């Protein structure tokens, strides 16, 4: 079946101060390749075979190579020890595995916006997205499995949980102390996170996003709820519930499993545009195209 283990009898270890212990280095490598939504080809399928799951992950790797050599992917280098997940899709609610319908207001925004967006090339670094610039993928995107850098480290102290994602070296420090409701004044890139324990599950509610780390068109009204539950000695179920009435007609839930990999996985220093020529090449190529078009126009 999947990498996850039975949740019914498993009791996670406790920290010295009596909270469920989620600490360690986890990876989402097994979840790489799981589509967000259930495809038509698996409409009546509850689970893939191991062979189908392996082929799906390989397709996902090959389809996302673009500027990266195949040899440098985690699956090629041998970092990936866990078998590919046989989970059909991440969306588990609605039960059909499909995202809810978008709102009429959001459809109107998309319809009015799309025809007016001209082909653009970056003029300055800020014209490129925060993911391209290796700044942030946002609170939803940062947790998602990718073709590499799927490590996740959790560190706990009394009243706090730190979650560090290998991709873009993002770290969130989440208080689990009782707090009053969310204020409305300050909106940030990663929002305001409030944590609490529900039995053995860490529940994190995120509000007050500024809308600039949008996920699938989400707005600053989005409310994100994240649930982390150890389901076995080496597995942790992660659920994310998105409630954005400005975009979707109802909330929806996704889920996948992290696998504990303390023995051989290490989060080393992450460097992106700081140590290569990606941004320089992107901007200089755009300026070269501008110059070529200007020269062609002058010669007409």
Task: Explain the meaning of each model-derived region.
Residues 1-300:
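PEST-like low-complexity, intrinsically disordered acidic/proline/serine-rich tracts
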